[in-house]
Amino acid sequence: MGERAKALLVDDRKDNLLALEAILQGLPVTAVAVESGEAALKQLLTDDFAVILLDAHMPNMDGFETASHIKRRERTRHVPILFLTAADRDAQLALRGYAVGAVDYLTKPFDPWVLRAKVSIFVELWGKSQQLKAQAEATRERDAQWERLTETVDEAARVLRAGGEDAATEALALLEKARWGS
């Protein structure tokens, strides 16, 4: 369960990616930086992320198109997307970001401490989600064990009800086998 959370940083400008990596330094998250929407989609095929920081304006596939692809995929639709963009007075762009599934839309320059706080929250939520998944798996395994034990007890009871000279020995063997999980 000790898997470290990852943040996907998507921006066509290397200097912006370096700035984002510096802002996230010290947080319990591994930053994975890519320079295009296409590269982001490719990265999402192999890695799971706690959060995506996505530049809205990029050549070829912009952030809005990238986000819509991310939200259409079953494997990635739950990953929170924070749009980051250059100072923009057009409120319609923020609305467009929310329409394609963003959880937030920040314009540059933004307060790095605010971004750190937002990323920290999503990393914490991701960690809780991982814990819940592990607990759900443990519960499924326990339920399966109980199901097998119940079936064995039922079988032993059938053997005893059927009677016969070896019924008790056979029922006991079934129960012992179940007890040791074989």
Model regions and ranges:
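Conserved acidic segment of CheY-like receiver
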Residues: 3-24, 32, 52
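Active-site residues of response regulator receiver
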Residues: 11, 55, 85
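Helix N-cap/capping motif at the beta->alpha junctions
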Residues: 33-42, 63
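Active-site beta3 strand of CheY-like receiver
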Residues: 47-54
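Receiver (REC) domain active-site loop signature in two-component systems and cognate sites
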Residues: 58, 70
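Alpha4 helix (beta4-alpha4-beta5 surface) of REC/receiver domains from two-component response regulators
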Residues: 65, 77, 88-104
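C-terminal output helix
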Residues: 110-119, 123
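CheY-like receiver
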Residues: 124-165, 170
